[in-house]
Amino acid sequence: YGFELISVPMTPNGPDMDIVEKLVAEDDTIKGIWCVPQYSNPDGYTYSDETIDRMAKMKTAAPDFKIFWDEAYIVHHLTEEIIETPVLLNESKKYGTENRVFMFTSTSKITFPGAGVSAIACSVDSMKYICKRFSVMIISYDKMNQLRHVRFLKNKEGVLAHMAKHRRRLVPCFDAVKTAFNEELTPCGDIAHWTNPKGGYFISLYVMPGCAKRVAALCKEAGLTLTGAG
């Protein structure tokens, strides 16, 4: 689509904000940043309160800079601990930057992939902008599907109860992978390390430089398909 992606190193608290702040403050051709703030792929990191605050108040050279805030895993907990982060839209209002925020979520990893419902949160001005463009994309949404989701999930408590069922099925899978890593790789020394996420759908395995693609190929030969290795 004619735009360039700039990668920023990740930390356990989110993207390296020193780098983010420097980039967006100095270059007015940088128009936005895409973030998955909770259980972010591939490491399962959750942005800290400080990171979210810095996102909300950072100075940007581009007056039309946007933050695309993808809450893909907002309720995808793998432990009994319910991690909640500050709402970026609320934080941005403290600094008068709410027009830069677009927050997204959906039920694609809750009910039906590709056939769930989605939601957008943004400022009033931004919502007017979006609705004007949505009006030429679709005449009417799938109201029956929306109704099915409301009747099934009902409310926040219903969503969390449903996700607890997902967790009971997923946790044994995560445990099996981590057990295999500990039993097979730990005795070999520093050849690999891996993440222990509290939520999301991924465990990241880090192997020695130059080995990732070969490891993925061997896994595929053994019948285990992994997310593309780099």
Each language-model region and where it sits:
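Short, solvent-exposed loop/turn segments at secondary-structure junctions
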Residues: 13, 38-41, 73-75, 108-111, ...
